[in-house]
Structures are given as C-alpha cells and as structure tokens.
Amino acid sequence: MPTPATIKSYQDIKANIEGACQRIAPLWPLKHFVAVNPYVGLRDQPFWRADQTLRKITGKGLTMPRPYYEEQIANGRIIQEDLDEALKQMHSNWSVTQLKQVMKQRSASRNVPFPVFADAMFADDRRDWPGFVVERISQYCAAYFDEGQATWSMPWRDDPMYQAWLKFMHFDKSPRMVGLRGIGEAAAALPAAAETAIALALKELSVPFDLIDDYLFAALLSIGGWAGWARYLRWQAELKGETDQSLRDLLAIRVCWDAILHKTCADIAVRKQWHLMLHTQQNRAIEKPSEHVDAILQTALEIGYQRSLIKSLKEASRPSNTVIERPVAQAAFCIDVRSEIIRRALETVAPGIQTLGFAGFFGVLMEYVPFGSNAPKGHLPVIFNPPYRVCEDLSHASEDETQRHAAKRQLRLRVATAWKSFKTSAVSTFTFVEATGLLYAPKLFGDSMGWTRTVPHPDERGLDSGTKQRLRPRLIASGNGKSSAKSTGIPETERAGVGEFILKNMGLTQTFARLILLAGHGSTTVNNPQGTGLDCGACAGQTGEASARIAVTLLNDPATRRGLEEKGLKIPKDTYFIAGLHDTTTDEVTIFDTEDLPTTHAKDLAQLRQWLADAGELTRLERATLLGTASQAPEVVTRDMRRRTRDWAEVRPEWALAGNAAFIAAPRQRTRGVDLEGRAFLHDYDWHKDAGFSTLELIMTAPMVVANWINMQYYGSMVDNLRFGSGNKVLHNVVGGSIGVLEGNGGDLRVGFALQSLHDGKRWIHEPVRLNVVIEAPQAEMESIISRHILVRELVDNGWLYLFQIDDDGSVYRRVCDKQWPRMT
C-alpha cells in the first residue's frame, strides 16, 4: 500500500469522514430501546432528494413497492382527487390518466446499491463475500462492545476500537478458512491511525474524489446496525461534552477490509469489475421526483390521510370560550397514540371528566436510580440531559431497614448472576441439564401454557412482593441503599419552578378538579428483547410510573404549592394529584400511593377506579379488531390480552404505535368526540393562555421532534426493513448483553422494528405516511419558531413532516414553501 506521504490528494479526508458519520442515525440499546428517525442524518436534504440519495447508496428509496400503491387505489384508499393533488404538489405534467398508464410500465433500469469491493468479488464468483466481511466485523464488534454477556472478554477492549481491531486481525484465521490468503499480513501493514488508514484505503481502491462521500456512506450502511450503535456512543458522549471515535474507527475497519481484499486479490477480472462499478456510479442518472411514479403515489397516499383527518377536525365541535365548570375529575395521559383510544373511552363513560395530553415524563427531567442500585436510568426524552437524579426508596423505613433491604436485593441479584453464569459455563452445560432438568418441568409447563411469567419483570428482580409494594421515588435526598457522588432529589428551592413548568405546559393552570390523575404508560410482555420499545419513549424507553409518581409527589408537596401560589398558580386545598400507570397491553390502569389520599376523597377515588375499568373495557374491545378477537365477549377479550403479557410465544402482544400518522397540539375540545383511530399524538395546548409562546416553542422543538422520530422509525422499518428494520422477530438473538439483536446467529446488528410489529401475517397494519402536524396557534408565531431552530426548519422546509395550522374558526391551512399557508378546502 502507498505510504501516508503519497496521499496528498486525500488531505481533506477528515471532512469526508465526518460527513459520512453524521449521516448515521444512533441506535439506542435494548434497555431503553427508543424509536429514532433512521434518516435523521439526511434531514438537511429535501425528502425526495434524500430518496434519490438512498436509491443511489442502497438501491432502495423512501417508497413502497409499486403493487402496494396499486392495492390502495383498488380498495379506494387512494382516490382520483388524491392523485390529482399529488401531481400538482410534485409539479408533474402528467394527468391522472397518463400516470396510470406509466404505472403499468415497469422501469427498465434497476436501482443498484453503491458497491463496496466485496460486491465486485461476489459478481465474479457468486460467493457471499459482502456477507463474510459483515460477519467478521459484526463478531468483532460484539466482542469489543460486549456489556457482560460474553463468558470471556476480549483482551483489547481498553484500546481504541481501530487499534484493537489491528490486534484482533493478527489472530483471526477465519479468512484463511474460506480461501483468502495474505489477509493477516495486509492488516499488519496498515497504519496505526484510523484517519490515515481510511485515506490509504481510498487510494488503494482508487475511489474517485467525487465518489468519496457516497462510498464512505455506503461502507457505513453496509454495517449499518453497528454503525448506529457507535453513533449512539458518540451521541451520549456529546451530551456530556465529551467525544467518542468509535464510529470513525468502525468506518476505518470497514474500508480497510475492502482495501485488504483489493490488495490481496490477484484476479485481474475482479479489479476490472470494481473499476467498472465505480465508473457506472459516476455516470448514473436518477429520476426526478416529478417523474418518479412511486413518489407521486406515496404523496397521494399521504394526501388521502390528510383529507380524512382534516374532514374530521372540521366536523368536530369548536372550542368554547366560556368558563368550564369544575370537572368531576381530570386525567392526564401521555401524548402516545395509544392514549388517544383510552382518553376517548374515558370521556365516553364519564362525560364530566376532562382528559389532557402531555409527554409521559410529565415535565420532570430526571434520571431514576432503582432501589439498591447506583446505575441510573434516564426518565426523559433522549434529546435532553437530566438535571436531577431521583432515587427509589423504601417508604416508612429507617436508614438501617433501608440498608438491610437494599443489601438483601443486591445479594439476590449477585446469586442470580452467579447461578446464570454457572448454568451457561462450559463445564456445567450438559451436567446441569442432566442433573436438574426434571426440576424445571413444572415451570416449563406453566410458562408454555402462559400461566406464569418466564422471568420476573426487570424492575422486580431481587425483590419480594412486600418490599416491592413499599418502594416509591423520593423527592428529597436519599441514600437508596447505595452511596452516590451526585446529589439526589429535587432541591426545595427549585420545586415550585418545576411544578410551574409541569402545569403550564400541561395547560392546567385553572379549574382544578378534586382528583387529578397523572397516568404514565408501559407495556407488559415476555421473551421480547425489544420490549422497552413498547414503553414510554418520553421516558427513554422506561415505563412512566416513576415519572408520574415523582410529579404527583412534587405537586402535592405543601412547600411546592406555596411556591406555586407566589407564582400566581393557586391549587385548591381540596385538589389532590394521584399517579397511575396505563398498561398498554391490557389497557388496565394501576393507581399508586392511594394511602396518601385523605378519607374525604375515598368516593372520588372509587368512582375514578370504576370509570377507568369501564374505559379499559371499551378500549380493549376497540383494539380487539386488530388483534383478531373482535367477535368475542368482553371477558374473553380481557383474558386474551392478559395472556399476551405472559405468553413467551406471542410475537404481537400489542400493536404499539403502528398506524401513527398525526400530531395535534390544540385544546381537547377541538378533538373531543372525534375517532382518530389511535393514530394521533394528542398534546393539549391553548395558545390564548401561552404568554410569550414558550409552550408552543417547547412543543415544536421537543414533542413534535420526538413524534417525528417515532413516525420515521415506523416508516423506515416498513419501506426498507432490510436496512432500517429488524426482520423476523422469531429469529432475534440478543447480542452484547443489552446492545441489540441479531437476526439468527450472525450478520449485522438489526435496527428498527420487526415485521411482526407492522404486519399481521396477512396485511400491513401500519401505513407509511409522513407525520401530519396540526397546531392551533398563530402562523406568525410558528414561523418565528421555525426560523430560530434549524432542526425544526429542516423538518418543515425539507418535507420530513407536514405542518398545518388550525384557526379559531376551524379553518385549516397547510404550510408550503416560501412561508406560504394556503387554505385547505
């Protein structure tokens, strides 16, 4: 290979490397598996230009296969009016008739992914060399990043990733086993610096300067799962003001594999094939969006949903300016689309109740430390850093009792870990099964029948039921049974400020009910590595229980209320907040800390419990339609949904956020009584009460962005499940402890959602449409926020979501280019 001194023409390679790394979306670990926009690195491009980029790099863009759209036209989901409007929006000169004629013509050209050198080898002998390279890198990454799953740890994990790989390659004999010679020697000749190695690799491969960016992006996407994990490590480091070079090092490893294969390849035909592939890419032509049939059809699909949504909103009752009488109760749920159904059901069984929508962390930016642990878990949107650390503690206990129970839990966890290590060790694998296998027969039978949980819930491991019932978050500093260098709790001087933030952004500043429920949400499943993806995204993939309970504790705190009153927020003395958890698998709501309520509110609590039970039944019956039990009696539906929480063979315990398509920030009266089919994120917002529009700014920069991430994660998982989804859930195997999953026993780390989260085996349950954001607020204020925040501006101006404004009279306007807002008819 050439020496660094000879690569003067690659002196600006650092910018290319950084550009490729920025294109990769982070992948959060399984312990808080939150949805991420897989195209977040392309948001600086208009949506349909990003489609062109992806088709050039991966061979697959941002649309579904043509037959999908043909089916939507055939069943009436896309109508003539939608096609007409789509052609206008895409600036196409075709008529609908011409479009349908072109639809019948299959393109003669095929989108070919941007090649890596292993593709040239595959083209020559049809052996899966690209798969071999991915397998070698994936196994290396699993060992290097392992978080405790491996019995033996890699010896070079303390070295930078690229330098550790150089040492690993010295011992890796697998290339020789598949007939590759000289790999180890070529790897040994690589430079020690990752950036220098990348430059040398590009020189070795003769990648033209104008293709460097595309090649580096393609190289990272060829190992996209592990690239996402490395991007996550960088993301976490940046939140702390630090740096992490794992992604750059992974890129160096990937391109060096290509360079090594090229250097050791003696076949002239393969080298010629490689240069031909590069030449083809340089002369490649991509369809314009106006001529891209599937882009027009995708736009028509989205217009069809907008037509239905806007019609429903226009037909809804208008918000009233009259003073609302005191509600019989108030219940705040997360903005999650699953909350839309239970909120609608609760308002049906109790018309006098007021429901609210707010992000499920309930405004408390914290990390939460489980009892007996010193490892905090984020309970806030992943785009924020937690200013507070709150500990779970044993209620009504002395310090000595707390320490005893914490020590007992720690001992149980250590014993469980040691027992698991013994069962999986090399010396006991066979003898253990032979000696004790029969003892596990009752549990195996119970687990198989779905009568028992296969394993305890992670939050309950090492705890007996009595201790579990006594655990709760503490507002004040707590030892939690463990020492901590970081102060815990929320300082008393800051509580009124936090309370004000919660109430104002929830839209709850007057007319307080006697009883106010803050209901977080979570899911209950077993044998589901990606189970945290069903929990609350606003709580970083945790349940909303801790967030709801700490918010309630704070809002009931007398000192906090005195501080709130000084800020002009007077909560009546007979108003009490109470925390709950909505189980989205069973639609049952558990209420916590009821012993804190005075006896004067016993009837209020009993009535609320009954309303929640009735609403849960209505919600289950509505959801049963998609779960195949719609014709069953209510008690049968309930039993089936409870079974799903324990059944280790259930691949579709619930549909989670499948179908999500809209984000609405408006007074509840705007959507109350409207069946939004569990497809809309609902955030309560009244701009008339938002002095300075700080709440509007928060909504557009946080919940709206998070909803876009969720929406795009589902979108990407459906239109390109191979790269941005996780394949078949049945084949998932956990790797690295809690890093992620492989499909089967090898290949790349998988990202996104499994097919079972999108498809019921017969038809698609999710519909790939970009998020439709509807906000009831002045256009000028929204434009001001768009202009101040580049992230929001990129999402809106580049078409990664649709933005609509709804006026006080119910008129709807769509935001288009040049800051124009034409009225929707």
Swiss-Prot record:
Record lineage: Bacteria, Pseudomonadati, Pseudomonadota, Acidithiobacillia, Acidithiobacillales
Listed GO MF terms: zinc ion binding
Localization per record: Cell inner membrane
Gene Ontology cellular component annotations, sorted alphabetically: plasma membrane
Amino-acid positions noted as binding Zn(2+) in the UniProt annotation, renumbered to this chain: 334, 336, 521, 536
Signal peptide: none
Gene: dabA
PANTHER family: INORGANIC CARBON TRANSPORTER SUBUNIT DABA-RELATED (PTHR38344:SF1), UPF0753 PROTEIN AQ_863 (PTHR38344)
Full protein name: Probable inorganic carbon transporter subunit DabA
Cofactor field: Zn(2+)
SUBUNIT field: Forms a complex with DabB.
UniProt-listed InterPro entries: DabA
Task performed by this protein: Part of an energy-coupled inorganic carbon pump.
Family annotation (HAMAP family): DabA
Family: Belongs to the inorganic carbon transporter (TC 9.A.2) DabA family.
Organism: Acidithiobacillus ferrooxidans (strain ATCC 23270 / DSM 14882 / CIP 104768 / NCIMB 8455)
